[in-house]
């Protein structure tokens, strides 16, 4: 089960049907990706919710202007085909307008942070 793909699909589908919140399974990876989306201003808030023994993350979506109201998320590295990049060849999403979320040896971070720290890693997804 690919929890990152589930997270991306849930957020994408919620934007399509104008939902305000998205509930996904709480994993450390999903929490870190959510933290990055929150820092970069793509979502409004994140909170954790426990339902019995299961934990969920609840994302409150942020809508932009009426014309351009949804963000685009694209899964890059998949379980069947991992995509890695070293820091000099780290891709710039839309010429720097978007971000790449990268899993490195020092945790999950944006492409900008990875370039500053001069480390490469697995490119999880693009967000713009």
Swiss-Prot record:
A molecular function (GO) term: rRNA binding
Compartments (UniProt record): Plastid, Chloroplast
GO cellular component, one term: chloroplast
UniProtKB keywords: Chloroplast, Plastid, Ribonucleoprotein, Ribosomal protein, RNA-binding, rRNA-binding
PROSITE patterns: RIBOSOMAL_S8
Record-linked InterPro entries: Ribosomal_uS8, Ribosomal_uS8_CS, Ribosomal_uS8_sf
Gene Ontology biological process terms from the UniProt entry: translation
Gene3D superfamilies recorded: 3.30.1370.30, 3.30.1490.10
Chief localization: plastid
Pfam name, any one: Ribosomal_S8
Protein family according to the UniProt entry: Belongs to the universal ribosomal protein uS8 family.
Subunit (UniProt): Part of the 30S ribosomal subunit.
Role this protein plays: One of the primary rRNA binding proteins, it binds directly to 16S rRNA central domain where it helps coordinate assembly of the platform of the 30S subunit.
Name of protein: Small ribosomal subunit protein uS8c
Origin species: Welwitschia mirabilis
């Amino acid at each position: 089960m690919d929890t990152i793909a589930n997270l991306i699909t849930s957020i994408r589908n919620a934007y399509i049907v104008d939902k305000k919140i998205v509930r996904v399974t709480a994993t450390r990876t999903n929490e870190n990706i959510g933290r990055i989306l929150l820092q970069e201003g793509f979502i409004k808030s994140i909170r954790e919710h426990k339902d019995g023994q299961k934990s969920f993350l609840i994302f409150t979506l942020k809508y932009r202007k009426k014309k351009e109201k949804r963000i685009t998320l694209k899964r890059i590295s998949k379980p069947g085909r991992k995509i890695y990049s070293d820091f000099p060849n780290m891709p710039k999403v839309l010429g720097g307008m978007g971000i790449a979320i990268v899993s490195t040896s020092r945790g999950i971070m944006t492409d900008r942070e990875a370039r500053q720290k001069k480390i490469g890693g697995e490119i999880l997804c693009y967000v713009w």
